[in-house]
């Protein structure tokens, strides 16, 4: 795996947090998902991932469209050469790292991605997450990792028969992700 490590600036964290506070009206309203603060932090994690991917596309001089949605619906995260890229972001605890984690996809989100003609899914991990509190520690969150990508339709090959949580209908091991450099060559 040829992951890319990217430092996370305070400005990026602040921009992502402001976005999360706007998005809370439209996301993570499922019963039992946790406190309002925990839900904001889940959106914050996703927003950091999107901004990190945007930064990496810019650094690689790849032209793209970006939808940093704060309304009810979004059509895509990124579009490059008319190909839609979805970005999934998960937090990890520094002491445990991210290598044991997987790309998870919920059934309803996967079906929506197929309807919207998603081409690729990129997995990003950020440090500083506390799994017990389900909160991101701003002071410990300083690095993101673009772990790789998968062609979106291939996610269906990873149906998770041992589903334990909301959102783990599909479970893609990191070893099955392609290096992000390969995606960039195809753009």
Where are these regions (language model features)?
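Nucleic-acid endonuclease domains
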Residues: 1-81, 88-187
């Amino acid at each position: 795996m040829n992951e890319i490590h990217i430092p996370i600036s305070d400005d990026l964290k602040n921009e992502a947090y402001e976005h999360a506070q706007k998005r809370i009206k439209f996301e993570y309203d499922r019963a039992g998902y946790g406190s309002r603060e925990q839900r904001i932090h889940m959106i914050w994690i996703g927003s950091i991932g999107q901004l990190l991917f945007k930064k990496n596309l810019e650094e690689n001089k790849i032209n793209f469209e970006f939808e940093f949605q704060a309304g009810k619906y979004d059509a895509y995260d990124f579009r490059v050469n008319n190909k839609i890229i979805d970005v999934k972001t998960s937090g990890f605890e520094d002491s445990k790292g991210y290598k044991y984690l997987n790309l998870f996809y919920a059934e309803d989100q996967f079906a929506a991605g197929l309807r919207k003609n998603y081409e690729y899914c990129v997995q990003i991990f950020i440090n500083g997450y506390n799994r017990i509190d389900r909160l991101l520690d701003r002071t410990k969150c300083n690095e993101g990792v673009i772990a790789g990508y998968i062609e979106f339709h291939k996610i269906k090959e990873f149906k998770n028969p041992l589903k334990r949580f909301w959102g783990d209908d599909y479970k893609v091991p990191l070893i099955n992700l392609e290096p992000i450099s390969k995606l960039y060559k195809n753009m």
